[in-house]
UniProtKB/Swiss-Prot annotation:
The lineage of its organism: Bacteria, Bacillati, Bacillota, Bacilli, Bacillales. It catalyses: L-leucine + NAD(+) + H2O = 4-methyl-2-oxopentanoate + NH4(+) + NADH + H(+). It holds the Pfam family ELFV_dehydrog_N. The keyword Phosphoprotein does not apply. The keyword rRNA-binding does not apply. This is Leucine dehydrogenase. Belongs to the Glu/Leu/Phe/Val dehydrogenases family. One of its GO terms (biological process) is L-leucine catabolic process. It comes from Bacillus subtilis (strain 168). Pathway: Amino-acid degradation; L-leucine degradation; 4-methyl-2-oxopentanoate from L-leucine (dehydrogenase route): step 1/1. The gene is yqiT. One of its GO terms (molecular function) is L-leucine dehydrogenase activity. NAD(+) binds at G180, V181, G182, N183, V184, A185, Y186. SMART domains: ELFV_dehydrog. Catalyzes the reversible deamination of L-leucine to 4-methyl-2-oxopentanoate. InterPro entries: Aminoacid_DH-like_N_sf, Glu/Leu/Phe/Val/Trp_DH, Glu/Leu/Phe/Val/Trp_DH_C, Glu/Leu/Phe/Val/Trp_DH_dimer, Glu/Leu/Phe/Val_DH_AS, Glu/Phe/Leu/Val/Trp_DH_bac/arc, NAD(P)-bd_dom_sf.
């Protein structure tokens, strides 16, 4: 991997390698873009095949956070950390204390959070060394479980997509096929049920399915059958890449709007659903409620204020679909354009984030 060529191609700012022999820490912090503010992104712990795979993942995820934060209207850039190791057996307190000191050394250019393989408890340990961490225990003034807030954002985004497809944002009487009934999807189902939608659900966890059936009168189907259901809206809320060659030809929905990450297996599948006339709410725009919520901690968390910001996902999806129509491009490209246009507007007056008295961090 020609590292500097790759960083130059996608305009990365900084890559930080963190090592602590005593604790076993091997971490890579990638900072993609700080035009809008300090880089916010979680810390992932994973058993990577090799160091190059870890570097590539950190870079890819950091760039994704730039777009997610920008499209969400946050005054934050994009970053990400990967820690090389098995989260089930390689963790120790010293590791996260050492990592916290590395974050502190960046003086606010990067703020971390929980991600795959890390926990709230890990964030609390990091917090012993630095304030540049979010998603810590509620006792320290954090926002707590993000699932209900993420679900509310998906619900708002789904209504905006429904308005584009059906001429009204009312979901009453609409049939919605929800794939996955985990914490976020369960809360989404609650909102949909309260508005009078008809729910079809599936999950590999039979208990989760049964709970949705009992609580919301949902109809359960086998996991492989969810794509072919007669429904108005398909809501992918489990694994990624469920919009692919096999599933697209089965879809009968007019709208795709759900909480899952990386819903398109390949970008060409986004082109396909656009050509089919399906209204698509891009994943990183519609599921941004979690990051919007956690970002509010930087101001001193206020649940009412955070929820008000999450309501804005409705308008964000509207803008994405307007750009899609304006420029004649698929929604996934329109989401990228929304983020890029916002960054470019700010770039004219600001090139790189440095800690000073006029950033989000000065309000902590």
């Amino acid at each position: 991997m020609e590292l500097f060529k790759y960083m130059e191609k996608y305009d990365y700012e900084q890559l930080v390698f963190c090592q602590d022999e005593q604790s076993g820490l091997k971490a890579i912090i990638a900072i993609h873009d700080t035009t809008l503010g300090p880089a916010l992104g979680g810390t992932r712990m994973w058993t990577y095949e090799n160091e190059e795979a870890a570097i590539e993942d950190a870079l890819r995820l950091a760039r994704g956070m730039t777009y997610k934060n920008a499209a969400a209207g946050l005054n934050l850039g994009g970053g990400k950390t990967v820690i090389i190791g098995d989260p089930r057996k390689d963790k120790n307190e010293e590791m996260f204390r050492a990592f916290g000191r590395y974050i502190q050394g960046l003086n606010g250019r990067y703020i971390t959070a929980e991600d795959v393989g890390t926990t709230v408890e890990d964030m609390d340990i990091i917090h012993d060394e630095t304030d540049y961490v979010t998603g810590i225990s509620p006792a320290f003034g954090s926002s707590g479980n993000p699932s209900p807030v993420t679900a509310y954002g998906v619900y708002r985004g789904m209504k905006a997509a429904a308005k584009a497809a059906f001429g009204t944002d009312s979901l009453e009487g609409k049939t919605i096929a929800v794939q996955g009934v985990g914490n976020v999807a369960y809360n989404l189902c609650r909102h949909l049920h309260e508005e009078g939608a008809n729910l079809i659900v599936t999950d590999i966890n039979k208990q989760s399915v049964q709970r949705a059936v009992e609580d919301f009168g949902a109809r359960a189907v086998d996991p492989d059958d969810i794509y072919s259901q007669d429904c108005d809206i398909y809501a992918p809320c489990a694994l990624g890449a469920t919009i692919n060659d096999d599933t697209i030809k089965q879809l009968k929905a007019k709208v795709i709007a759900g909480a899952a990450n990386n819903q398109l297996k390949e970008t060409r599948h986004g082109d396909q659903i656009h050509e089919m006339g399906i209204v698509y709410a891009p994943d990183y725009v519609i599921n941004a409620g979690g990051v919007i919520n956690v970002a509010d901690e930087l101001y001193g968390y206020n649940a009412e204020r955070a929820l008000k910001k999450v309501e804005g996902i409705y308008g964000n999806i509207e803008r994405v679909l307007e750009i899609s129509q304006r420029d004649g491009i698929p929604a996934y490209l329109a989401a990228d354009r929304l983020a890029e246009e916002r960054i470019e507007r700010m770039r004219r007056s600001r090139s790189q984030f440095l800690q000073n008295g006029h950033s989000v961090l000065s309000r902590r």
